[in-house]
């Protein structure tokens, strides 16, 4: 079972509803603004339709944070838009969980959004069924790495369209960003999966932006002491660099004033 499936909590389940989440409509506007930066003349009607359909399909579902579930696919779509992907991929990102977690079918998607979007969502749904966990801790490192490599190859082979992998990476990235709401055991399992499967795939595809953030978030849960030590060192270097730049600017300004 994947962490995505565990995230779906229905309205009648006992959860503490968070009061500190972003309004879905505000997230949607952020998505549209992001898309229009690189596709200013693009017709957004299909994206708007996908948002309405996904909102209705997920309306009684919540994440473990207490947020409405629609927050997740919207964030996935924003990550994809930040990578400047095409409109069909953005739409599939918004709809990527509706077949697995709601009553909607692939046929429904094909009828409403066309073959391209339906095939992308179907590809993501199939990837989510690959069992990524379950390695025996007593096996050698070489054996575990071979198993991880086999999983990576299976993952890539099953995705007939590279955009399916992009959606899955965006899906995993947002789940990693919100991993604090999972149990400690789930945090370790998901972070390990991310480190062993998703980070190498992102590296192979040359998506350094996602790879780096996935690595950082994995380290945060697998080796928290090392992670926070690194964060502290980076912050210290930034402060030193900022002080140097500010001093340099002040020197230049003073020289200009003296020369003027």
Question: Where are the model-predicted features located?
Answer:
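Active-site helical microenvironments for divalent-metal-assisted chemistry
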Residues: 1-260
């Amino acid at each position: 079972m994947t962490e995505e499936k565990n995230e779906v909590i229905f309205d009648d389940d006992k959860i503490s509803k968070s009061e500190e989440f972003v309004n879905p409509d505000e997230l949607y506007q952020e998505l549209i603004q992001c898309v229009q930066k690189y596709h200013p003349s693009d017709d957004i009607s299909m994206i708007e339709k996908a948002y309405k359909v996904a909102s209705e399909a997920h309306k009684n579902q919540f994440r473990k944070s207490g947020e409405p579930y629609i927050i997740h696919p919207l964030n996935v779509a924003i990550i994809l838009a930040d990578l400047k992907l095409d409109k069909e991929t953005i739409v599939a990102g918004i709809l990527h969980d509706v077949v697995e977690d709601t009553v909607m079918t692939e046929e429904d998607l094909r009828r409403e959004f066309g073959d391209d979007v339906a095939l992308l969502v179907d590809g993501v749904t199939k990837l989510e069924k690959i069992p990524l966990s379950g390695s025996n801790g007593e096996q050698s490192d070489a054996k575990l790495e071979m198993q991880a490599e086999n999983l990576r190859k299976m993952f890539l082979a099953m995705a007939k369209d590279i955009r399916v992998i992009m959606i899955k990476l965006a899906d995993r990235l947002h789940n990693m960003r919100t991993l604090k709401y999972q149990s400690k055991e789930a945090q370790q399992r998901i972070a390990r999966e991310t480190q062993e499967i998703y980070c190498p795939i992102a590296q192979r595809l040359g998506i350094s932006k996602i790879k780096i953030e996935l690595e950082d978030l994995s380290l945060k849960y697998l080796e928290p002491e090392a992670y926070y030590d690194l964060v502290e060192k980076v912050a210290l270097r930034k402060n030193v660099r900022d002080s140097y730049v500010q001093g340099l600017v002040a020197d230049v300004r003073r020289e200009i004033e003296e020369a003027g």
